[in-house]
């Protein structure tokens, strides 16, 4: 067969890549063509994404792809919840605002004065997080109502890139489900949520499934760059769901961790789980590929180490991630623990000092040097994963033979081993580039080269290496987990 060339554009919260995927009928080989930083810009006190620069970088990737021949298609995935507003002439009204901007502070409670919290969850099945799109829109209506009045269409970040690539103004299902405005059962915008919160339905586009063929790239872009028009595919726009498509799981029941800046921990289901327990535990039902539901929790992940490293660099200490991991591996275990999801750790800044303060206030020994701090973060993440695993088991009534860990976090052998130890479960780590492989494979699925999600995963398994970590020292980890639950689980973990 003829080889297929696809471009996977993958935006993370700190960097972006344009990757070439080549499919020979059995395997996908990937090659990085272009990598670039994705740094927010603070202007007049508001934190923005630099969308124009990011679109420029996509174009650079397209230019670099020319030497590899015709590109059959392109797909874009990004982080969730953020969006751009388009006016009636099709112009971007302003750069998209970053989810870490402070504008949503207090919006969660304000929403409950307009809509019953239980009813809100019953409809959306979504984890309540102040960063969610719905709360960003509430903040916009309160603080800048004129901007929303001028908007003709809201486009989530991957949809925004797709629009400027090919002209389609639609909302892909997986990224739409991060808004907390979607009915989890009907997979459509919830009129009740929108009306209760006063959000205008007119700005929301039609929802299309993952794998929708949106059309050819605009002639103007192709002429500018000197390229042939490739097809734009709406892959799973939320990077988590593109990564999940690439989990090489053979069992129907499996746990996944998409481990990057955020750790998304969950399982794949055919139908949403929405009940009193899932609401109490704040577990979300996110839309996936081919109508699947990802029943998961968003956990602050490697952000804690990334932001700590940035602080140490500001202090003149240039540590690589590998060096930090080795230092942590040599540090004494279980000196102090934190809840990675504590509100104090959400904003950028001096994370090491905030960790010390949390440990001091909770009566624990305070981590001193960098090694102890990184060890504290890794152990705390592993215990948070165990707690979430127990919660998901309670909600689904199922047992899971293994944890599939994908993404950049799999490069930390220490975190993978700690996760296996804490969870009493083998960890199958890899692929590292799950999001890119999933993005590319979903383009092949849309083109008819692959038949279904099972075949997507089989191709990924043939294309990437995995490592297996068996649990060790489980008795010691169990003892400390009991202490962790008492400190950080609701009701002291009595429900677990």
Residue ranges and their predicted role:
Residues 1-94, 122, 150, 222-232, ...:
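N-terminal glycine/serine-rich phosphate-binding loop of ATP-dependent small-molecule kinases
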Residues 2, 7-8, 20, 112-124, ...:
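Active-site core segments that coordinate phosphate-bearing ligands/cofactors
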Residues 38-44, 119-120, 170-177, 200-203, ...:
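Gly-rich Lys/Arg/Thr-decorated short loops/hinges at beta-loop-alpha junctions or inter-strand turns
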Residues 47-55, 126, 130, 207-211, ...:
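Short acidic-aromatic active-site loops that bind/stabilize oxyanions
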Residues 63-98, 127-131, 158, 162-183, ...:
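Short beta-strand-loop/turn "lid" adjacent to the catalytic site in phosphate-handling enzymes
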Residues 70-78, 153, 206, 398-407:
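Short glycine-rich phosphate-binding loop at a beta-alpha junction
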Residues 77-80, 210-211, 259-262, 402-410:
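Glycine-rich beta-strand-to-loop/alpha-helix junction loops that act as flexible
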Residues 101:
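Carbohydrate-associated surface elements
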């Amino acid at each position: 067969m003829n080889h297929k060339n696809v471009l996977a554009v993958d935006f993370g919260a700190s960097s972006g890549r344009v990757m070439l995927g080549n499919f020979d009928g059995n395997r996908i080989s990937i090659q990085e063509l272009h990598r670039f930083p994705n740094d927010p810009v603070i202007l007049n006190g508001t934190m923005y994404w630099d969308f124009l620069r990011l679109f420029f970088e996509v174009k650079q990737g397209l230019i670099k792809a020319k030497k590899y021949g015709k590109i059959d298609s392109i797909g874009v995935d990004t982080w969730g919840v953020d969006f751009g507003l388009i006016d009636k002439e099709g112009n971007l009204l302003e750069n998209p605002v970053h989810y870490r901007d402070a504008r949503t502070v207090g919006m969660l409670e304000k929403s409950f004065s307009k809509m019953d919290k239980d009813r809100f969850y019953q409809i959306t099945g979504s984890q309540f997080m102040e960063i969610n799109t719905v709360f960003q829109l509430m903040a916009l209506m309160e603080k800048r109502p004129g901007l929303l009045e001028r908007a003709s269409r809201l486009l989530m970040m991957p949809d925004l890139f797709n629009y400027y690539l090919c002209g389609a103004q639609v909302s892909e299902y997986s990224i739409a489900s991060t808004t907390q405005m979607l009915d989890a059962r009907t997979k459509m915008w919830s009129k009740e949520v929108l009306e209760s919160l006063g959000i205008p339905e007119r700005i929301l586009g039609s929802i299309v499934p993952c794998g929708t063929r949106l059309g050819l790239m605009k002639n103007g872009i192709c002429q500018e760059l000197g390229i042939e028009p490739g097809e734009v595919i709406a892959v799973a726009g939320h990077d988590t769901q593109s990564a999940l498509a690439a989990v090489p799981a053979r069992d129907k029941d499996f746990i996944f961790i998409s481990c990057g800046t955020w750790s998304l921990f969950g399982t794949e289901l055919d139908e949403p789980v929405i009940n009193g327990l899932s609401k109490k535990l704040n577990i979300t039902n996110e839309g996936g590929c081919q109508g699947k539901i990802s029943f998961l929790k968003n956990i602050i992940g490697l952000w804690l180490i990334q932001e700590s490293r940035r602080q140490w660099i500001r202090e003149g200490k240039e540590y690589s991630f590998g060096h930090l991991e080795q230092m942590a591996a040599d540090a004494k275990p279980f000196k102090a623990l934190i809840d990675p999801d504590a509100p104090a750790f959400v904003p950028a800044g001096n994370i090491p000092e905030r960790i010390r303060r949390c440990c001091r206030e909770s009566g624990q020994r305070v981590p001193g040097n960098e090694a102890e701090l990184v060890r504290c973060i890794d152990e705390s993440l592993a215990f948070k994963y165990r707690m979430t695993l127990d919660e998901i088991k309670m909600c689904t009534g199922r047992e899971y033979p293994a944890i599939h860990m994908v993404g950049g976090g799999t490069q930390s052998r220490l975190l993978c081993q700690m996760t296996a130890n804490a969870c009493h479960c083998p960890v199958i780590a890899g692929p590292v580039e799950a999001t890119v492989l999933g993005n590319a494979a979903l383009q092949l699925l849309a083109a008819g080269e692959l038949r279904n999600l099972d075949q997507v995963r089989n191709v990924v398994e043939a294309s990437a290496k995995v490592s297996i970590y068996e649990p060790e020292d489980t008795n010691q980890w169990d003892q400390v987990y009991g202490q962790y639950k008492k400190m950080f689980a609701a009701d002291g973990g009595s429900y677990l």
